[in-house]
């Protein structure tokens, strides 16, 4: 008991010292930081919960009870009393578009607007903005097309804003857009224009005149390519915005789901300025871009991207689009859409897809596939199975994102093929897209089987978390609550989407920590709080295990730490 009392006295002295110098701590350099008196959830294999943790030179060196840490405290140690607060590993977002959506924040932002009048009010503000005056365009993002019948808004909405200034808006699904008459005129999109490859020009059923709604990038870019190009400064600002937002949500790693050379150059510039405070795992798109079917061109680009690799920046992933989305009926289904008899389209035919996946697998590259419809998910799983038969088991950690629909017979295949399921769990609730578009086009029975997260988990599949920001918020707590409740966290929308697919808290936290770190090939250095790993930590204002599921989306990150350095803090 004496030893314990003496140690407690010494510890108390350090705490008093730290409190006394609270206002000058930022000016003092400590080689060690001791966190004590916390509820520290390690997310190691045993899911241990401890009260203290020691960080030295950015690495975790001790994890356990306070007595284990006290021996290490000296004059070079900063002691932080967590006062019972919850600490856990930082989050890892395994599917996002940080730079692209960061740049979008510089333009006309329509995110979280749920009525036409609010949308028009923001557009009118954008019309009067300095950006529009200097560029002669309104380029916007975040339009909720679920607010419109069949997800097909009309150009007249934008013509009411301006008939002289071209306007092009990305929808918040990332696969649809809306253009006004001026923008369509500049792009020469008329009733005579043929459908673009893998895209759709929505039309008036009577006249064939373009309605203004465009599906997929091949159609949207016909307009967007005419708008002023984003500069390197825009890319740098976009990255800075995205990084700050990520830190505020406790995120220290992102998987950038589709990059080009300009994205990689922006990350590299930030790294060289010592301003890259995220771990970034990047994927180069194959199968849909202008060099999609030209292997030599793809390899040239891939090799150029590899030259940008840095300590926190890595490209070793290939992104393949298998299909589009249900909203434009470009999502590939096993059974037809009810109103058209269409079953969507696979972007790569079976043999080409199988050979591409097998080839990249043999080259030790991760293949990250976009699959929305159940036919697309099956095609992706078939391709991974083909690669497994061709190459044997390799440690490439392939995964499929989105997974809106999965046939019941394919659910066990995730575990059998060791393919991870990267869900955007924030989508797993009855929003305007599901109630206004999906139910009419595929029926309530199929809608009730959407986003079968628990079924994949129960069958042994690895569940991984990703936001697909800015389709939905980057905030992991919103995704986690939605996965647990299958309801709208805001309470704005009513209803539950198949409660049988509800997930537990621990498994969803693992999806955003150790599981996502695994997908990014960095679970050996981060993703859990274990000795020898980087001190990538977050401190929360509430203990997630002490509150009800409907409170989780309200939890705030108090501090985000990467490699022992605080990058976000609420004072």
Regions found by a protein language model. Give the residues of each.
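Bacterial N-terminal signal peptides that target proteins for export
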Residues: 2-10
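Bacterial Sec-dependent signal peptides at the C-terminal "C-region" and cleavage site
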Residues: 15-31
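Ligand-binding beta-strand-loop-alpha-helix segment within the catalytic cores
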Residues: 420
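Acidic (Asp/Glu)-rich catalytic clusters
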Residues: 271-274, 304-309, 393, 415-416
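His/Asp/Glu-enriched, well-ordered alpha-helical/loop segment
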Residues: 237, 358-368, 372-398, 402, ...
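Divalent metal-binding segments
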Residues: 28-36, 41, 45-300, 316, ...
């Amino acid at each position: 008991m004496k030893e314990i009392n003496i140690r407690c006295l010494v510890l108390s002295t350090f705490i008093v010292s730290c409190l006394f110098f609270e206002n000058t701590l930022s000016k003092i350099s400590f080689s060690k930081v001791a966190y004590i008196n916390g509820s520290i959830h390690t997310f190691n294999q045993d899911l241990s919960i401890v009260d203290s943790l020691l960080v030295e030179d950015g690495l975790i060196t001790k994890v356990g009870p306070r007595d284990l840490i006290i021996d290490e405290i000296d004059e070079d140690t900063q002691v932080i009393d967590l006062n019972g607060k919850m600490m856990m590993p930082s989050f890892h977002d395994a599917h996002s578009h940080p730079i692209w959506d960061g740049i979008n924040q510089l333009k006309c932002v329509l995110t979280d607007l749920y009525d036409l009048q609010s949308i028009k009010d923001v557009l009118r503000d954008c019309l009067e903005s300095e950006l529009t005056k200097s560029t002669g365009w309104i380029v916007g993002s975040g339009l909720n097309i679920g607010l419109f019948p069949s997800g097909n808004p009309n150009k007249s909405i934008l013509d009411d804003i301006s008939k002289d200034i071209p306007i092009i808006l990305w929808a918040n699904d990332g696969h649809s857009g809306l253009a006004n008459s001026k923008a369509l005129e500049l792009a020469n999109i008329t009733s005579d224009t043929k459908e673009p490859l893998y895209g759709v020009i929505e039309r008036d059923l009577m006249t064939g005149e373009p309605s203004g709604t465009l599906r997929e990038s091949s159609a949207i870019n016909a307009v967007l390519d005419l708008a002023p190009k984003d500069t390197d400064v825009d890319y740098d600002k976009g990255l800075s915005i995205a990084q700050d937002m990520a830190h505020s949500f406790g995120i220290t790693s992102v998987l950038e789901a589709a990059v080009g050379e300009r994205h990689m150059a922006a990350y590299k510039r930030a790294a060289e300025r010592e301003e890259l405070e995220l771990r970034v795992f990047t994927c180069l798109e194959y199968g849909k871009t202008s060099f999609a079917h030209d292997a030599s061109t793809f390899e040239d680009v891939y090799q150029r991207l590899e030259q940008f690799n840095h300590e926190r920046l890595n490209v070793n992933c290939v992104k393949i689009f298998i299909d589009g989305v249900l909203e434009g009926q470009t999502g590939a289904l096993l059974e037809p859409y009810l109103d058209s008899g269409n079953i969507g389209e696979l972007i790569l035919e079976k043999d080409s897809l199988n050979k591409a996946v097998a080839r990249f697998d043999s080259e030790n590259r991760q293949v990250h596939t976009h699959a929305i419809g159940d036919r697309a998910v099956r095609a992706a799983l078939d391709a991974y199975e083909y690669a497994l038969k061709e190459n044997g088991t390799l440690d490439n950690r392939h995964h499929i994102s989105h997974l809106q629909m999965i046939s019941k017979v394919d659910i066990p295949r995730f575990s059998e093929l060791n393919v991870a399921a990267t869900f955007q769990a924030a989508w797993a609730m009855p929003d305007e897209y599901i109630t206004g578009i999906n139910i009419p086009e595929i029926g309530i029975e199929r809608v009730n089987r959407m986003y079968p997260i628990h079924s994949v988990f129960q069958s042994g599949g690895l569940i991984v978390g990703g936001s697909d920001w800015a389709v939905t918020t980057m905030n992991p707590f919103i995704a986690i609550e939605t996965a647990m409740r299958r309801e709208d966290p805001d309470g704005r929308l009513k209803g539950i989407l198949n409660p049988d697919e509800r997930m537990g808290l621990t498994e969803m936290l693992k999806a955003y920590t150790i599981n996502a770190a695994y997908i990014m090939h960095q679970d050996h250095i981060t993703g859990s709080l274990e000795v020898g790993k980087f001190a990538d930590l977050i401190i929360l204002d509430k203990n997630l295990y002490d509150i009800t599921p409907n409170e989780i989306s309200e939890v705030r990150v108090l501090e985000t730490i990467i490699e022992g350095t605080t990058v976000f803090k609420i004072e």
